[in-house]
Amino acid sequence: MQDLQKIIDDAFENRANLSPSAAPAAVRDAVASVIAGLDAGRLRVAEKIDGNWTVNQWIKKAVLISFRLADNEVMAGGTNQYFDKVPTKFGDYTPEQFREGGFRVVPPAVARRGSFIGRNVVLMPSYVNIGAYVDEGTMVDTWATVGSCAQIGKNVHLSGGVGIGGVLEPVQAGPVIIEDNVFVGARSEVVEGVIIEENAVLSMGVYIGQSTKIYDRATGEVTYGRVPSGAVVVPGSLPSADGKYSLYCAVIVKRVDAQTRAKTGINELLRGA
């Protein structure tokens, strides 16, 4: 792994000189190995170690380099054709591979090669980008998007139209992380490497980036970039210092209780392949 990382780091420093027709075989092989590892879930752009999230920047670099090494090619998809550098994850899947994967893919859902889909995941007509990790039992509902390298935990519900930001453009230091058992309400957006800790609930229409104020009404505290475990968050606003206008914020209104769980719990009947 150390050798692989060194090849990727060196290639990234030399990325301006890489192209589909000009790249050393060692670089091609290293990038292909990383993409295959991401696709199978053996590698992750970010992982939780001793309770803290660590970003593997070299893996993210490999994803970026992969775009320099590939030409666009035509891809068939139902009645349509596509033209891109990254193949789809399921383009050459056999029925046996789908059964072995243990997930469901509802047309016209798309996942790119280099993303990982765990067992009992349901992909409604949605989009999962390269480098993303979607863990077991998660529902990605209709028109939801999981951005490049985003990390989605177990038993998460991403409601219709949810946007989970990626890291490739604009380039972000770390991916968005949605931990286990999180519920994200319809049309909400989480971007710019924000972390939503386990068991949190975001209501419909909550938008959180690194500069979004997260106001806890119980304590009056304002934080940024992380929603604490078990928080229930709704959209709100805070007044300006001069009282002349208000600006958007996310408001922690309470902690998850039995009533909240009854409204946001997953339906086991919908899981399983």
Curated annotation (Swiss-Prot):
Its EC number is 2.3.1.117. Its main location: cytoplasm. GO terms for biological process: diaminopimelate biosynthetic process; lysine biosynthetic process via diaminopimelate. Gene3D superfamilies: Hexapeptide repeat proteins, Tetrahydrodipicolinate-N-succinyltransferase, N-terminal domain. Pathway: Amino-acid biosynthesis; L-lysine biosynthesis via DAP pathway; LL-2,6-diaminopimelate from (S)-tetrahydrodipicolinate (succinylase route): step 1/3. One of its GO terms (cellular component) is cytoplasm. Substrate binds at residues 104, 141. PROSITE patterns: HEXAPEP_TRANSFERASES. SUPFAM superfamilies: Trimeric LpxA-like enzymes. Pfam families: Hexapep_2, THDPS_N_2. Transmembrane segments: none annotated. NCBIfam families: dapD, PRK11830.1. HAMAP family: DapD. PANTHER family: 2,3,4,5-TETRAHYDROPYRIDINE-2,6-DICARBOXYLATE N-SUCCINYLTRANSFERASE, MOLYBDENUM COFACTOR GUANYLYLTRANSFERASE. Belongs to the transferase hexapeptide repeat family. Homotrimer. This is 2,3,4,5-tetrahydropyridine-2,6-dicarboxylate N-succinyltransferase. The gene is dapD.
